[in-house]
Amino acid sequence: MNFENLLIEVGTEELPPKALRTLAESFLTSFTDELTKADLPFESAVWYAAPRRLAINVLGLALAQADKVVEKRGPAVSSAFDADGNPTKAAQGWARGNGITVEQAERLVTDKGEWLVHQAKVVGVETKSLIADMAQRALDKLPIPKPMRWGNNKTQFIRPVHTVTMLLGSELVAGELLGITSNRIIRGHRFMGKASFELDHADNYLAALKEQGKVLADYELRKSLIKADAEAAAAKLGGIADIQDGLLEEVASLVEWPIVLTASFEEKFLNVPSEALVYTMKGDQKYFPVFDKAGKLLPNFIFVTNIESKDPQQIISGNEKVVRPRLADAEFFFNTDKKNTLESRIASLETVVFQKQLGTLKARVERISELAGFIATQMNNNGVETNSVDASRAGLLSKTDLMTNMVMEFTDTQGTMGMHYARLDGETEAVAIALEEQYKPKFSGDTVPTATVSCAVALAEKLDTLVGIFGIGQAPKGAADPFALRRAAIGILRVIVENKLPLDLVELIAKAQALHATNITNTNTSDDVLEFLLARFRAWYQDKGIQVDVILAVLARRPTKPADFDSRVKAVSHFRGLEASTALAAANKRVSNILAKVEGELPATINSALLTEPAEKALADKLVQLQPQLAPLFADGNYQQALTLLADLRENVDQFFEDVMVMADDEALKNNRLALLTNLREQFLHVADISLLQ
């Protein structure tokens, strides 16, 4: 079998930068899936992407499918010949359809009889004749939410397509993609190098584009070059560049020939909170801010241009002129906002509707304030020192920064600007920090607040939304979640679990519902919210790699304290790894099945005088021996140690089921043994329903 390297490039108008990686990865995955379905082996495959092109390179691709033999079964011999031994019409028709005579057919004997068969040789198809159709199917599967048409073309794609190149080694693959006929023309950089050139071989794609077209088609190479050059530029300034991967990806998707330059802005702008300046530089301009080693913003920024200029200073000056008005706006907004305190803005929240049925933002902050104070009190009552006055105050001020000029213009600074303005207003540091941290965690992988006041406010903010929206019957359906309730639910669970807060969801939900008063129309709000949170718990732990049966075993106990839930999950996960776990899980399942069949109330008291068999005596004695050790462990939530102790019951339990007839004819003996099993099961149920472990 012969092999060659394949290149496919689709040349387009500028592609959406935030979608570039996804498009390229999807193209590669779908195309290699097509190769696999077509029985075309290959060594490896990579994708390339730049603002005006998507490309895939398949290495070591077979030039044709392998020939194969396909067994085509015909009629049974019993129905293939008549009484005289002549072929029937059915046999003749089958043979004719396969291009043979009945006499040429082979016979296959199976346990169900004897059959006529034909071993048909199927010649493999040349790869080059399959490529275009496979590539088109792969392109059709790209995740394109809003495809577009261009010119008189009925073809749809994410952006207009200008060129298509398909090369198998040096051979041009015939065919069309997206209405464009395959040719050797590759377009270069818009302003540098050759506008277009012909590619002679698939292996020369990257080098020819770089040398002739001034385009670095290797996405990861562009990304690494930008990062390295930006870090070096920042080091020359004595600082560190803020190069978050999301922005780096976007910048790498905007340029074909990245050139990193350094610029500056007036130091007076550093009097504005750095978050607002950074938001402007990163969000609007796609610049990399620079900080000193102490984390203080420097009056410099790093940007990436798509052209190698003879006069880079002109480009630098141009970018400085562009960013200055934005920084001046931030300075103006900050100085204007400082003239009014956050407290003075509370009244204006009455003019903003949070949600039609749930009232205004003023009503919302009043609910958050009371709920945050309640949560802080609950934390205090359970040994976690929290200033409930600060929690209530932070809740009341939590949305006031939404009424400032800065946040209205730079929306992503909400919370952060609240913190800065609170400090200027003389609010306590705990209140100021809580205003910023109320929204945490904002995304998957984000940190959670750790300060107790911040935790109380963050929980209150999320619970108010969750209970309110569920209360008016607008729970998430399918993928739709307009109020981000799933994120809020995960946030609630993470704040409680990661800070080990002794809080009960039932109590928090009940308080939040009471504060909504007449807003609530759903009579099952509390139950619905709790079920939603428990479902999020399951999803969260699954994402962390916890086995489903472990989660279900804990969920069966319906623990409503997330920190306690977490301890149980960790304990059961540990127990699952013990040698005794499989046998004890099976025994618990057997016990559950036996007890489920008992009519009426289960016997609860074990009468030692009725323990007649050595195995049941040994099990009862072991339980009596363990209970004084288990009780304090259950009380302290030390479930892992408790289950480790219970694992010692394995031999006793195995021997019990080996030697003892539970459902004895003697009613007293039977009930006593049922009581023993009830007691055994209850010890495990203090932690989880172990019978659900697989």
Curated annotation (Swiss-Prot):
Per the UniProt entry, the Enzyme Commission number(s) are 6.1.1.14
Compartments (UniProt record)? Cytoplasm
Q: What are the record keywords, sorted?
A: Aminoacyl-tRNA synthetase, ATP-binding, Cytoplasm, Ligase, Nucleotide-binding, Protein biosynthesis
Q: Is Protein biosynthesis a UniProt keyword of this protein?
A: yes
| InterPro entries cross-referenced by the UniProt entry | DALR_anticod-bd (IPR008909), Gly-tRNA-synth_bsu (IPR015944), Gly-tRNA-synth_heterodimer (IPR006194), tRNAsynth_Ia_anticodon-bd (IPR009080)
Catalytic activity, as annotated: tRNA(Gly) + glycine + ATP = glycyl-tRNA(Gly) + AMP + diphosphate
Specify the domain of life of the species encoding this protein: Bacteria
| Signal peptide stretch | none
Q: Which GO terms describe its cellular component?
A: cytosol
Q: Assign the protein's first listed, main location to one coarse class.
A: cytoplasm
The biological process GO terms on file are: arginyl-tRNA aminoacylation; glycyl-tRNA aminoacylation
Q: Which GO terms describe its molecular function?
A: arginine-tRNA ligase activity; ATP binding; glycine-tRNA ligase activity
NCBIfam families the UniProt entry points to: glyS (TIGR00211)
Protein family = Belongs to the class-II aminoacyl-tRNA synthetase family.
| Oligomeric form and interacting partners | Tetramer of two alpha and two beta subunits.
Name the chain's protein. Answer: Glycine--tRNA ligase beta subunit
According to its UniProt entry, this protein's organism is Shewanella frigidimarina (strain NCIMB 400)
